[in-house]
Each structure stands twice: as structure tokens, then as C-alpha cells.
Swiss-Prot record:
<keyword id="KW-0547">Nucleotide-binding</keyword>
<dbReference type="InterPro" id="IPR015273">
    <property type="entry name" value="Cys-tRNA-synt_Ia_DALR"/>
</dbReference>
<dbReference type="GO" id="GO:0008270">
    <property type="term" value="F:zinc ion binding"/>
</dbReference>
<dbReference type="InterPro" id="IPR009080">
    <property type="entry name" value="tRNAsynth_Ia_anticodon-bd"/>
</dbReference>
<keyword id="KW-0648">Protein biosynthesis</keyword>
<dbReference type="Pfam" id="PF09190">
    <property type="entry name" value="DALR_2"/>
</dbReference>
<dbReference type="GO" id="GO:0004817">
    <property type="term" value="F:cysteine-tRNA ligase activity"/>
</dbReference>
<feature type="binding site">
    <location>
        <position position="259"/>
    </location>
    <ligand>
        <name>Zn(2+)</name>
    </ligand>
</feature>
<dbReference type="GO" id="GO:0006423">
    <property type="term" value="P:cysteinyl-tRNA aminoacylation"/>
</dbReference>
<feature type="binding site">
    <location>
        <position position="230"/>
    </location>
    <ligand>
        <name>Zn(2+)</name>
    </ligand>
</feature>
<feature type="short sequence motif" description="'HIGH' region">
    <location>
        <begin position="37"/>
        <end position="47"/>
    </location>
</feature>
<dbReference type="GO" id="GO:0005524">
    <property type="term" value="F:ATP binding"/>
</dbReference>
<dbReference type="InterPro" id="IPR015803">
    <property type="entry name" value="Cys-tRNA-ligase"/>
</dbReference>
<keyword id="KW-0479">Metal-binding</keyword>
<dbReference type="Pfam" id="PF01406">
    <property type="entry name" value="tRNA-synt_1e"/>
</dbReference>
<dbReference type="InterPro" id="IPR024909">
    <property type="entry name" value="Cys-tRNA/MSH_ligase"/>
</dbReference>
<dbReference type="GO" id="GO:0005829">
    <property type="term" value="C:cytosol"/>
</dbReference>
Length: 492
């Protein structure tokens, strides 16, 4: 019997503003889409928090034995500066400023994004589509929206008429905004725009002559609107109606509101059952901003190369710190806060290291089954990681009492307890045992150095066939050798 059948889950739905029982469209299967990064700069810590929250959600669904299709996109075209329809594409602007091809910018920051997520022990999504890889699908959606009369072409661009859409639907259903108020608070276009209404948004933009990123379409050589990209990619891989759509709270309006409108205009149905949004990350009580210097990149935390923190902190400590707050709560990052988290993380890991030495008794003096269910209850309550972590520290207390002989545990309970705590720490929260990792790295270094010594001896004996064989097999394992004046070094 799958674990999910005995662990009912509640999710806070931004659409209803309430916690709701989670019931997937197809039993045992979860379709989840999360808006990924626009790859024009280094991923910032707030982004990492959002993606980490959904990484834990993905992990927990897998732990509950669901089959999950997790789609997280890469936006590599169409995201206009200031998130409006007029102006310059963010990637094109970066390319112009740095005198690069747009796809060089995309490649550089996509690699950075993946490197950071790997460092923080993220599971890869099931599918990671790019906007530029789905231009045809986006054009087809635009055609359908035009056919409904809600989309209209103007001078080579295509816009979504929110007023016409709102006649039969509710533009503002997710954000709680009222279209009349939005229109009243928007300046008159005064003939300076091709839009019928100030709140109309672009489905397709005609490219100016100097615009590099462009594709042919029935309306012009141009590029798709930002909101359309996620509609095309989510529905292609998850269908017109799927379980979960997530992202940062800043995407609720206009991005996610526009996605709902596009889907309903195109298919006649609401696309998503559960909308989930993560809250922001502040730094020393203030909003992060590059312009004010109140900013820190993930890599700067790991290296210690910053003016904010007293020292470097590991990826696992940073991850542990972030998960101590619920994903819907504002989290303030500071030197004091992450230093305290480091102490807690070390306490947890020390307890786990001591667990294998615990001796089983004939019976248990603690209800370990109740503790285990309390861990599930925390995660089943809208993925409440801080409550789960509190339960893990309760387990640390149990382990210390067991070490001191002040509590007892049966062999059956010890096995169940050990399996559960390791699953919640490593599989669900995605933490890493850094001491074990460091030990493995030391062992690897020792083995490679031994092979380098064997290779050096083979070269001295003029046994070049063996020397080349050792080098080639190390390369096949991803280990590069570099011969220099001071000897041979290696990199992975």
C-alpha cells in the first residue's frame, strides 16, 4: 500500500486562501509546475529559497510514494525589463551591455543556476523546458486566443484584451484585484500604445530592427510574451488541467493571473487546482537590493567572500537555516541567524552519528511511533518544515537519553526510528552529512593519488601503455590529470 494512502495532506491554496485537502487529479500521480529563473544574471538567494521550498515539496511527494512529474522552466526570452510589455528584453539588454550573443548570456547563467542548485543538493526536475524551445506551441496558443476574440493584433504585436475576457471570466481571481480599480489607477494610454486597454498584456511582440532574438509568426518577426511561455510549457507537459503551480509570491500578479486568463481563454477551464506561493527573503530586516548593497549571492555565502557574514557557511547549513521557516513566512537572513542554525545543524548531525551505537533493549520507554507520526503530521500540514525540525530535535533529545541509559528502545523501534529520522533529514529535507562527505572526499583523494603514483612509476619504467590506461580510465570517471613541474595534480 502506498504511503500517501495513510498520510492525508493539506495544502494552502492561494486561489482560495485556505488550506485544502490534497486530492490529485489522477490518484497516485502529481503534476507540478514551478516558474524557473530568467537567466540574465546570477541566481539570488531569494530565488534559491523559492526553488528549495519546491524541492522539499517534490521530495515529500516522492517520499509518500507518489509518481511526480515536476516541470520547472528556464525563461530564456521574452521577459521584459520591469515586467511590463514596453521596453527591452532582460536577456537582450544584458547581451548588449556585455557585448555578448544572447545565447551566451543564457548559457552562462543557466550553468550558474544549475551549479548553485547542485551545491544546495536539489533534486533535478522531471523536465526543464526552455521558452525558446517552445515557440511553435506558443504561436498555436495565440491563434486560439485570437479565434475567441480575446486576442487582437496591432501593428505586428498581439495583445490579450482583459476587459473582454472579464465579461465572462474573472481577471483578478488569484490576486484578489478588481479590474475596474486596476483600470482606474492606470494612466490613460493617450494614443501612445497599440493596446486597447492599459491592463492588456502582450502575447506576441513585434521585434524592433535591432532586436536579435526573433522568430517568424503570422503577425511579425518577433518574440513571445513572458506570461505565454509558462502557459505553453506547463500545458504541454502536464495537460490543460494539472495539480500544482508554484512560484514566488511576487509572481502572483501579473504573471500567474495572466497564465490563468490565457488558459481559460484557450481551453475554457481553470488550469490548476492548487496555486502555491513562497514568501520573500530579507537581509538584516531589509529587502535585498543590489542597488543599496544589501545583497548577498549564494556563492558568496559558501566562499565567505562578502561583507555581510563573519565567515563562510556550508550549503547544508544554509539549507537547514532556510527550512527553519515555513515557506509562506518571510525569512530574515543575518549573520546571527545562520550562526545559530549552524549550531543546530551540528547538534542534529552529531546525534545521527551516535545513533548506530545505540543498543536495543527488550522494550521501549518512549512512544516512538507517535514521534514518527508527529513528523508526518508536520509535513502533512502544508509542508511545515519548522515543525518537522522541532520534532527532529525532540529525536535528538531521545538519542541523548538513550546514550545515557535514561530511556530504552526495542530492536524493532530502533530500526523504525533510525529509518524514519534518516528519511526525514536526508530524503525529505535534503540535508547532507558533511563530515561523511568530507571523509569520502579524503578517501577519493587517497585513491587517486595512489593511482597517480602507479602512473608515475609506469612512466619511469617506460610502460607507457599502463600509464595511458590509468590516465584514460580516470578521465572516463571525470577525473582530469594535469602534469606540471611540481608533479601531477588532479581535478574533478
Amino acid at each position: 500500500m502506498p504511503l500517501y494512502s495513510s498520510q492525508p495532506l493539506k495544502i494552502y491554496n492561494s486561489l482560495s486562501g485556505e488550506k485544502e485537502n490534497f486530492k490529485p487529479i489522477h490518484e497516485g500521480n502529481v503534476g507540478m509546475y514551478v516558474c524557473g529563473p530568467t537567466v540574465y544574471s546570477n541566481v539570488h538567494l531569494g530565488n534559491v529559497r523559492t526553488f528549495m521550498s519546491f524541492d522539499v515539496i517534490f521530495r515529500y511527494f516522492l517520499h509518500l510514494d507518489y509518481k511526480v512529474r515536476y516541470v520547472r522552466n528556464i525563461t530564456d526570452v521574452g521577459h521584459i525589463v520591469d515586467d511590463v510589455d514596453e521596453g527591452e528584453d532582460k536577456i537582450a539588454k544584458k547581451a548588449r551591455l556585455e557585448q555578448l550573443e544572447p545565447m551566451e548570456v543564457v548559457q552562462r547563467y543557466t550553468v550558474d543556476f544549475h551549479d548553485i542548485l547542485k551545491a544546495f543538493n536539489f533534486l533535478p526536475p522531471s523536465i526543464e523546458p526552455t521558452a525558446t524551445g517552445h515557440i511553435i506551441e506558443q504561436i498555436e496558443i495565440i491563434k486560439k486566443i485570437i479565434d475567441t476574440g480575446i486576442g487582437y493584433e496591432a501593428n505586428g504585436s498581439v495583445y490579450f484584451d482583459v476587459v473582454k475576457y472579464n465579461e465572462t471570466n474573472n481577471y483578478g481571481v488569484l490576486s484578489g484585484r478588481n479590474i475596474e480599480d486596476m483600470l482606474a489607477n492606470t494612466r490613460d494610454l493617450d494614443g501612445q500604445s497599440d493596446k486597447r486597454n492599459p491592463q492588456d498584456f502582450a502575447l506576441w511582440k513585434k521585434a524592433e530592427p535591432e532586436h536579435i532574438m526573433r522568430w517568424p509568426s503570422p503577425w511579425s518577426d518577433g518574440f513571445p510574451g513572458w506570461h505565454l511561455e509558462c502557459t505553453a510549457m506547463s500545458t504541454k507537459y502536464l495537460g490543460n488541467h494539472f495539480d500544482i503551480h508554484g512560484g514566488g509570491m511576487d509572481l502572483k500578479f501579473p504573471h500567474h493571473e495572466c497564465e490563468i486568463a490565457q488558459n481559460e481563454a484557450c481551453t475554457g477551464q481553470s488550469p490548476v487546482n492548487y496555486w502555491m506561493h513562497t514568501n520573500m527573503l530579507t537581509l538584516n530586516g531589509k529587502k535585498m537590493a543590489k542597488s543599496t548593497g544589501n545583497n548577498i549571492l549564494p556563492g558568496e555565502i559558501l566562499s565567505g567572500d562578502n561583507t555581510i557574514l563573519s565567515k563562510a557557511f556550508s550549503a547544508s547549513v544554509t539549507r537547514f537555516f532556510m527550512l527553519q521557516a515555513h515557506y509562506r513566512s518571510i525569512l530574515d537572513f543575518s549573520d546571527d541567524a545562520i550562526t545559530a542554525a549552524e549550531k543546530g545543524y551540528k547538534r542534529l548531525m552529531e546525534a545521527l552519528e551516535a545513533l548506530p551505537a545505540i543498543k536495543a533493549g527488550s522494550s521501549s520507554s518512549v512512544d516512538f511511533a507517535a514521534w514518527k507520526q508527529a513528523c508526518y503530521d508536520a509535513m502533512n500540514d502544508d509542508f511545515n518544515t519548522p515543525i518537522l525540525i522541532a520534532q527532529l530535535f525532540e529525536a535528538v533529545r531521545y538519542i541523548n537519553l538513550l546514550k545515557e541509559g535514561k530511556e530504552t528502545i526495542s530492536a524493532e523501534d530502533l530500526k523504525s526510528f533510525s529509518t524514519a529520522i534518516n528519511a526525514f533529514v536526508f530524503d525529505v529535507l535534503g540535508l547532507s552529512d558533511e563530515k561523511a562527505a568530507d571523509g569520502n572526499n579524503d578517501k577519493l583523494e587517497g585513491v587517486v593519488n595512489m593511482l597517480i603514483g602507479m602512473r608515475n612509476q609506469a612512466r619511469a619504467d617506460k610502460n607507457f601503455a599502463l600509464s595511458d590506461q590509468i590516465r584514460d580510465q580516470l578521465i572516463a570517471l571525470g577525473i582530469q590529470l594535469k602534469d606540471g613541474k611540481e608533479g601531477t595534480s588532479f581535478s574533478i
